Amino acid sequence: MTTNLKLNCDMGEGFGPWNMGDDDSIMPLIDAANIACGGHAGDPSTMRNCVELAKSHKTEIGAHVSYPDKQGFGRRAMDINGRALIDLIHYQIGALDGIARANGTRVAYVKPHGALYHVMLADVGVLNDIMTAVASWHAELELVVLATPRDRKTLQLAVEHGLTLRY
């Protein structure tokens, strides 16, 4: 078994004239960029800038999807599940994937952000909805999850959805 360690970082978390983080300095140091897709942060121009930067440094692009919570930076859990959550995730992946493809690259994986990530770890139904969204995307994407004592259930769901997981 080969273990492949990739350093990832949350990127593109500003919007409009407001910047957060030093994406220009960090991008050359990482293997994978979790780019905000407009839910907790990010806007079309910020996403494009990050995609161009990632492409120039041969950094993998990940969709950093979240609850629609810019005011709380995606850290507030929301009662969104089922079809509404799947649609929300498709919407955010679609925004980033469209910008990536317009710039000659693509999204390789999905990493939920903040409260959505933590709810996913605690609620198998939300995990299943996220996996459904990622698996039903038109391109093969991997899903980033945290290694937890519940790994067997997570792995079982991933197999059922035909997904590859990243830890």
Positions of predicted regions on the chain:
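Active-site rim beta-loop-alpha module in soluble metabolic enzymes
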Residues: 149-153, 157-167
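Charged helix-capping and loop-helix junction motifs
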Residues: 123-129
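A short alpha/beta connector and helix-capping loop motif
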Residues: 15-48
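Catalytic beta/alpha-barrel core
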Residues: 35-40, 119-120, 138-149
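Short, charge-patterned binding micro-sites
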Residues: 59-78, 113
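Hydrophobic faces of well-ordered beta-strands that scaffold small-molecule active sites
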Residues: 5-9, 33-35, 61-65, 108-112, ...
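Acidic (Asp/Glu)-rich catalytic clusters
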Residues: 24-28, 49-62, 101-104, 135
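Glycine/small-residue-rich loop that forms an oxyanion/phosphate-binding "nest" at active or ligand-binding sites
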Residues: 70-104, 109
